[in-house]
Amino acid sequence: MIARAISKAGITASPYHAGLKKADRATVQEGWSSGKIQVAVATVAFGMGIDRHCVRYVVHWSLPKTIEGFYQEAGRAGRDGLPSHSLVFYSPEDVGKYKYLIRMQGNKSGKGAEAERMAEKNIERKLEQLELMQDYCTQLKCRRNTLIKHFGGKSVNCQKTCDYCRNPKKVERSLHASSAIKDVRRQQNMFGKNGSRKSKGKQAWNGQWDKPHGDDE
């Protein structure tokens, strides 16, 4: 779907995922590596296998689950030293969905007190990592220095290489607009567009899976 939409805009794009035949995946990878395909719409696994230095953009269609993962994936852009961009399409609903999946997967661990203790500890760790990534996307401060400090480095002059340092007012407006949209959707989930109250089950479902997207670099 995403690759098709990009292609309609006049940019050559192809999907790359496990559902494709091996020969088709090889064709896409070869085409993208040679430059015939401008955009590969792919899974994280494909992205981490990239060894092409002239990547100009890495776009995350949804929120990465950890800062470490985001840093590795975004780092695939600009390995030739030239200016490049990392873009994240962030939605609060992504966070709700991931929290749900983390807890569901954690609850599938083995039985017994020790297994349950380890599962709970693992769930807490993953939720903390997710919260750090969410904070990165919603903060009102330099994103470059946030990453540097996360990995134990010292602050640097960003030189307007992140969206916040380039235009802090724009980032603030975007976050406020996203919050307002979320409030409107919450009201729609509770009462419906015609003003009638929905069932609690419907509210919970819509709250987890509706997905309006904002963006952060």
Give the location of each predicted region.
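A general structural signal marking secondary-structure boundaries and capping sites
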Residues: 36, 137-140, 169
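C-terminal accessory regions
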Residues: 126-158, 162-164
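A short, ordered amphipathic alpha-helix with a cationic face
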Residues: 87-89, 120-123, 133-136
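Helicase motor core with emphasis on the C-terminal RecA-like subdomain
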Residues: 1-111, 117, 155
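Generic alpha-helical segment signature
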Residues: 63, 91, 123-126, 140
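Accessory DNA-binding and partner-docking regions appended to nucleic-acid-acting proteins
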Residues: 96, 102, 108-118, 126-127, ...
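Soluble or luminal CAZymes and related metallo-dependent hydrolases
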Residues: 24, 122-125, 129
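Intrinsically disordered, low-complexity sequence elements enriched in Ser/Thr/Gly/Pro
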Residues: 23, 74, 142, 183-184, ...
